[in-house]
């Protein structure tokens, strides 16, 4: 074969490359439109039956010289790239996505700027039991410079016979204590009907793990001008967690804090399994601040310090933990709450590694 003939073949290969490129991009645009249609219908983007049908059709029409296995490998990569295009389009469309808003969202809680680069703490009892109990914890928190107090007034429990909380009376106690100690308060709301009433008493609406996909509650929380702390569901994927936050933001409320609180696995050594890798993933995928609840993720008082260190080291915007004047007589979760001296020691060990906004 002469050099001229070789050059002609190379030119032909170059032309075919450009034709293939054009067809691949044309296919990509079609796939993106299919993705939009599937999203509108609520259908999964990946359809293994459809993919197998397409591969079978391609192989049946393969006249060589490539082996069927080679052709199948090439087209599976094309299909994979198309699926990634659909997922990229979906993530770009989300209001919570960092692709939509590159800069960090800062959540203002009575002057505390969550997400500004300074790491903070939220502490308080698992459940509001009395004014005296909450006031004692508030005094200890205030002494340590903590400005956000947590406390459960409505308690969704696994058993219907466990303590369910004081309800509105608990919110009133939180409000009274917060006013006396100049603190912000956060408390869980479990039904949309309670949100309007709760606004008079709390500074942050908490949506707990069991309600992460209570979509009516998410929409109701998104419709009010009050910060929301959203906890990850017991067995929720990160994608499901992000989409739950999207429900809130889609209603107009962008003051959202995400909270990793452990997920359910087969491990029984801890109450849940802390997914520490979720923190940087959520920080990369969204523009929202991320907290870690070390109490519910472990269920063990002896693990609160190392898990809090891990949370701060990996870049969480803050740590949430439970404190009780006398955990041994607590009406809920006594094994995982810190007594006040334990809390003070815990915080003193963490303070040297806390990142402060310059």
UniProtKB/Swiss-Prot annotation:
<dbReference type="InterPro" id="IPR002701">
    <property type="entry name" value="CM_II_prokaryot"/>
</dbReference>
<comment type="pathway">
    <text>Metabolic intermediate biosynthesis; prephenate biosynthesis; prephenate from chorismate: step 1/1.</text>
</comment>
<dbReference type="InterPro" id="IPR036979">
    <property type="entry name" value="CM_dom_sf"/>
</dbReference>
<keyword id="KW-0413">Isomerase</keyword>
<dbReference type="InterPro" id="IPR010954">
    <property type="entry name" value="Chorismate_mutase_GmP-bac"/>
</dbReference>
<dbReference type="Pfam" id="PF01817">
    <property type="entry name" value="CM_2"/>
</dbReference>
<comment type="similarity">
    <text>Belongs to the class-I DAHP synthase family.</text>
</comment>
<dbReference type="InterPro" id="IPR006218">
    <property type="entry name" value="DAHP1/KDSA"/>
</dbReference>
<keyword id="KW-0511">Multifunctional enzyme</keyword>
<dbReference type="GO" id="GO:0003849">
    <property type="term" value="F:3-deoxy-7-phosphoheptulonate synthase activity"/>
</dbReference>
<keyword id="KW-0597">Phosphoprotein</keyword>
<keyword id="KW-0028">Amino-acid biosynthesis</keyword>
<keyword id="KW-0808">Transferase</keyword>
<dbReference type="GO" id="GO:0016832">
    <property type="term" value="F:aldehyde-lyase activity"/>
</dbReference>
<dbReference type="GO" id="GO:0009423">
    <property type="term" value="P:chorismate biosynthetic process"/>
</dbReference>
<protein>
    <recommendedName>
        <fullName>Protein AroA(G)</fullName>
        <ecNumber>2.5.1.54</ecNumber>
        <ecNumber>5.4.99.5</ecNumber>
    </recommendedName>
</protein>
<feature type="domain" description="Chorismate mutase">
    <location>
        <begin position="1"/>
        <end position="90"/>
    </location>
</feature>
<keyword id="KW-0057">Aromatic amino acid biosynthesis</keyword>
<dbReference type="InterPro" id="IPR006268">
    <property type="entry name" value="DAHP_syn_2"/>
</dbReference>
<dbReference type="Pfam" id="PF00793">
    <property type="entry name" value="DAHP_synth_1"/>
</dbReference>
<comment type="pathway">
    <text>Metabolic intermediate biosynthesis; chorismate biosynthesis; chorismate from D-erythrose 4-phosphate and phosphoenolpyruvate: step 1/7.</text>
</comment>
<feature type="modified residue" description="Phosphoserine">
    <location>
        <position position="2"/>
    </location>
</feature>
<dbReference type="GO" id="GO:0009073">
    <property type="term" value="P:aromatic amino acid family biosynthetic process"/>
</dbReference>
<dbReference type="GO" id="GO:0004106">
    <property type="term" value="F:chorismate mutase activity"/>
</dbReference>
<dbReference type="InterPro" id="IPR013785">
    <property type="entry name" value="Aldolase_TIM"/>
</dbReference>
<dbReference type="GO" id="GO:0008652">
    <property type="term" value="P:amino acid biosynthetic process"/>
</dbReference>
<dbReference type="InterPro" id="IPR052899">
    <property type="entry name" value="Class-I_DAHP_synthase"/>
</dbReference>
